Structures are given as C-alpha cells and as structure tokens.
C-alpha cells in the first residue's frame, strides 16, 4: 500500500499579485470542515507558538474557514494541492479587516500531529505557523476515498 503525503509551500500575501477583491462567500461553508481535526491542528500550532513565547492564534469559524473550505473543495476536485486564487482569499479577508494573510495546505495526512509536524519541518510552512498572525480558519475535509486535504489560513487582525 502506498501513502501519499504532500505539503505545498506556503503563500504569504506579499508574494501575490493583486486580483479583484470584490468577493462574497457563504459562511455556512465553514460548517463543512472537520472541526475535530481542525481543533487538534490549532491546539498543536498554539502549543508550538506558546513554546516560543508567541501569541495564541484564535479560531475563525466564519469567513476564513469558509474561504479555506472552498479552497479545500477546489483542491479535492483537482486531486492536488495548490495555492490557486490565494490573492482572492487574501483580499477578501483584508476587506474584512485583516492586515496580512498567509496559508498552508497539505494532503494525505491522517492525523493532526502528522500534518503539523510536516509543516514544522518545512521552513516556509514553519515561518507561517510562527508568523505575526492572530486568527486562523480551516478547511479540513476528506475526498470520496477518505484522503484528507487541508487548508489553514492565517491572518492578522
């Protein structure tokens, strides 16, 4: 049996060309995330941040999570991870008061500890986890084969 675990390098809003930011989303999408897994990820991220004396990240169960779920569904449809249309998500959150936005994505991990450890062993993902952010939204979902896809959006308010 072959297992595929993938993480994609993170995206920070400074690296993205601006797109049209006139974007609406159904916040009910946030309800579709696997909140048990998402909460475990957030706990692990905050444990790591606290060990460094960094501020605890607050969970955003509305807009950031709705954008994250939408992106996770998009990745599931393509069967690959990516940061496509990140600037749209970033600009939409900035329209709602965020000053900076970044995201980490992954697929194939079956436990929160595994995906967070993978991100922490990647310098670009680790820099997002340790970044100057205050809130995080989650799109944690399984495809029809039971494989997990992850989008974690970080932002500073």
Residue ranges of predicted features:
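Short, surface-exposed glycine/acidic/tryptophan-bearing loops
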Residues: 65-115
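Bacterial signal peptide processing site
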Residues: 10-14
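A short alpha-helix/helix-coil micro-patch that ends at or immediately precedes a cysteine
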Residues: 17-76
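C-terminal motif of bacterial Sec signal peptides marking the signal peptidase cleavage site
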Residues: 5-9
């Amino acid at each position: 049996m072959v297992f595929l675990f993938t993480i994609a390098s993170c995206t920070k809003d400074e690296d993205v060309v601006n797109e049209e930011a006139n974007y609406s989303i159904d916040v009910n999408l946030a309800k579709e995330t696997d909140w048990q897994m998402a909460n475990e990820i957030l706990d692990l991220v905050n444990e790591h941040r606290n060990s460094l004396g960094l501020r605890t990240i607050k969970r955003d169960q509305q807009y950031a999570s709705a954008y994250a779920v939408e992106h996770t569904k998009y990745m599931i449809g393509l069967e690959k991870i990516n940061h496509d249309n990140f600037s749209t998500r970033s600009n939409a959150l900035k329209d709602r008061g965020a000053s900076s936005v970044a995201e980490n994505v992954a697929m194939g991990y079956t436990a929160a500890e595994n995906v967070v450890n993978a991100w922490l062993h990647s310098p670009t993902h680790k820099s997002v986890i340790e970044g100057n952010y205050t809130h995080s939204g989650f799109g944690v979902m399984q495809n029809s084969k039971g494989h997990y896809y992850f989008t974690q959006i970080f932002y500073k308010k």
